[in-house]
């Protein structure tokens, strides 16, 4: 199925390389490929995953700010901005982080269908139920 305006936002500091690869593949299979592919990460992660990002056409969104949740905050700000400006049909967030629950609720209020993708064994049931759909990847 092909859907207009699909956005894939990856918490690259929170999921493995395998999950990133499988997330891109899964989104392509289910929605016809994401129009926006962004990975939010530290500078160290960006360098480490540079070849992966190039191969999968993922734009690294490097966060230079220090702090525990600074990458998560950058992803959340972009997600809201994209929801308002781009009006995507589907927003996919690849993360096993439960901190995104308020963001998911807000995106749904903005009319986005929000799908989560996370790592098996790292995402609690309570986190998964916030999303419209949630795909667990091994």
Predicted regions and their residues:
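Short, glycine/polar-rich helix-capping loops at beta-to-alpha or helix-loop-helix junctions
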Residues: 45-50, 119-127
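Short, acidic/turn-prone active-site loops that include or flank metal/cofactor-
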Residues: 64-69, 118-123, 138
